[in-house]
UniProtKB/Swiss-Prot annotation:
Mn(2+) 1 binds at residues 271, 348, 350. The active site is at residues 278, 352. Presumably involved in the processing and regular turnover of intracellular proteins. Catalyzes the removal of unsubstituted N-terminal amino acids from various peptides. Keywords: Aminopeptidase, Cytoplasm, Hydrolase, Manganese, Metal-binding, Protease. The gene is pepA. Its EC number is 3.4.11.1, 3.4.11.10. Pfam families: Peptidase_M17, Peptidase_M17_N. Its cofactor is Mn(2+). Binds 2 manganese ions per subunit. This is Probable cytosol aminopeptidase. Disulfide bonds: none annotated. It catalyses: Release of an N-terminal amino acid, Xaa-|-Yaa-, in which Xaa is preferably Leu, but may be other amino acids including Pro although not Arg or Lys, and Yaa may be Pro. Amino acid amides and methyl esters are also readily hydrolyzed, but rates on arylamides are exceedingly low; Release of an N-terminal amino acid, preferentially leucine, but not glutamic or aspartic acids. It is found in: Cytoplasm.
């Protein structure tokens, strides 16, 4: 879908559909008022008849209004308030898209200047709107033999005045890059585990590297992992016929010698739980256990689209967790790359076992900051539900930067404590550390485990177990989060 920014009067634009807004007060303003005046009061007359109450997300389609170049005018309700919430704006965009997709036209124009969102300037509002448009266009039907017949919109024009045009252009550019990254993340997450395994992700990384000269890609196999001393990582993979892969993608967009930012993604392409096997119900959704790695892929894709002037290293720890005669047993003790030993009390707490070695590996890049992203704990879903990612770390400035980025991107996170008292729950009588800390504070103790391997740099941990995918029904699938949060964080660091 092409997005174009124009500064013209709405009534003069030739388009299949012009989208304007009407509130519950039904007092017309902006583009709606202009259309009403030029059409001889056609809009006012319809509102007086009660055909549109103006509630958020309501819509009414008008055809062939006099003196209006658009073939149709779509009225969309914006509710009672002068300023919308982020959620209301997304609902309005969704309602407009639903209507537009059912029409014969392939283009539309949206009057942006009539929309106002709480605590957002022109850039923030326009970016949220464009991201919502892109989200509404996403379809994953690769394995459907009969594709859904949906009329695709080929072009949307964003109408704004000349003073705001530069901000809207910038917002549109950023939003489209983020949407591209989210779509890649969703595609990878939605792929079945018989296709999307560690080797597949390695090939995807190599393909991305070939397409971009400033992206160096290395894919390390199990022999290299053994040479590196990644005993914890290898322990997770040893029960599967699928070999593990450590994928390292090094983007050089900044100056040579600039310290990079490092993103580390959990890439468990299917998680049965291993010997500590999960219940059968819902196990199909464990293909989403690689969404941390998928979100790193997506964020990198957005960074490449935007050509951000930063250095970024992306490390993906990819494995499959399966039960077999060669699988890790509860009670096994392994030696991590750091030299610390781990007693594996539960093989279903495997994400931290691959991440700890990847986090140790990250030290060699002398990073400005390291952020790991993982569908790590069910406890995070219990604590925060499906709307907010869990955030923990060892540096307050980094935590605050990520919280702010999440707020800006409408991809929120919430900080949980990382107090020393929780560390005691990981004590083991036989090894340096146990891989679980009991039933209480599971998200926190998982982060405490990771913190043992991140003392050399500023580090944050995003637990996306509740936000990376939706369960059940037609909406089931990967969400693309937290690509908006991570991209916003990197945009802020790049200063663009």
């Amino acid at each position: 879908m092409e997005l174009v920014v124009k500064s013209v009067s709405p009534e003069t634009l030739k388009t299949a559909t012009l989208v304007v807004t009407v509130g519950e007060s039904r007092v017309l303003a902006g583009a709606a008022r202009t259309v009403d005046i030029l059409s001889g009061g056609a809009v006012s007359l319809i509102l007086k008849r009660g055909d549109l109450a103006g509630k958020v997300g309501q819509s009414l389609l008008l055809h062939n209004l006099p003196n209006i170049k658009a073939e149709r005018v779509l009225l969309v309700g914006t509710g009672k308030e002068d300023e919308l919430s982020d959620r209301q704006l997304k609902k309005i965009v969704g309602a407009a898209l639903t209507c537009l997709k059912g029409l014969g036209g392939t283009d539309a124009a949206i009057a942006l200047d009539d929309l106002s969102v709480k605590n957002r300037d022109t850039y923030g509002m326009a970016r949220l709107l464009v991201e919502a448009l892109a989200d509404g266009e996403y379809v994953f039907d690769r394995f459907k033999t009969q594709k859904a017949e949906v009329r695709a919109l080929k072009k949307i024009t964003l109408l704004t005045d000349k003073v705001k045009a530069a901000d809207v252009e910038r917002a549109s550019t950023h939003a489209q890059a983020i949407a591209t990254g989210m779509a890649l993340t969703r595609d990878l997450g939605n792929l079945p585990p018989n296709i999307c395994h560690p080797t597949y992700l390695g090939e995807e990384a190599k393909a991305l590297g070939k397409a971009h000269k400033n992206l160096k890609v290395e894919v390390h196999d199990e022999k290299k992992l053994a040479d590196l001393g990644m005993g914890s990582f290898l322990a997770v993979a040893q029960g599967s016929a699928q070999p593990p892969r450590l994928i390292v993608m090094n983007y050089q967009g900044g100056k040579k010698g600039d310290q990079p930012f490092v993103l580390v993604g959990k890439g468990i392409t299917f998680d049965t739980g291993g010997i500590s096997i999960k219940p059968a119900s819902g196990m199909d959704e464990m293909k989403f256990d690689m969404c941390g790695a998928a979100s790193v892929f997506g964020t990198l894709r957005a960074v490449l689209e935007l050509k951000l002037p930063i250095n970024l290293v992306c490390i993906l720890a990819c494995a499959e967790n399966m039960p077999s005669g060669t699988a890790t047993r509860p009670g096994d003790i392994v030696t991590t790359m750091s030299g610390q030993t781990v007693e594996i009390l539960n093989t279903d707490a495997e994400g931290r076992l691959v991440l700890c070695d990847a986090l140790t590996y990250a030290e060699r890049f002398k990073p400005q900051a390291v952020i790991d992203i993982a569908t790590l704990t069910g406890a995070c879903v219990v604590a925060l539900g499906g709307h907010t990612s869990g955030l923990l770390g060892n540096n307050d400035a980094l935590i605050n930067q990520l919280l702010d980025a999440g707020k800006q991107a409408d991809d929120r996170a919430w900080q949980l404590p990382l107090f020393d008292e929780y560390q005691e729950q990981l004590d083991s009588p036989f090894a340096d550390i146990a891989n679980i800390g009991g039933p209480k504070g599971g998200t926190i103790t998982a982060a405490c485990f990771l913190s043992r391997f991140t003392k050399a740099y500023h580090w944050a941990h995003l637990d996306i177990a509740g936000t990376a995918w939706l369960s059940g029904g037609k909406e089931k699938g990967a969400t693309g989060r937290p690509v908006p949060l991570l991209t916003q964080y990197l945009l802020d660091r790049a200063g663009v």
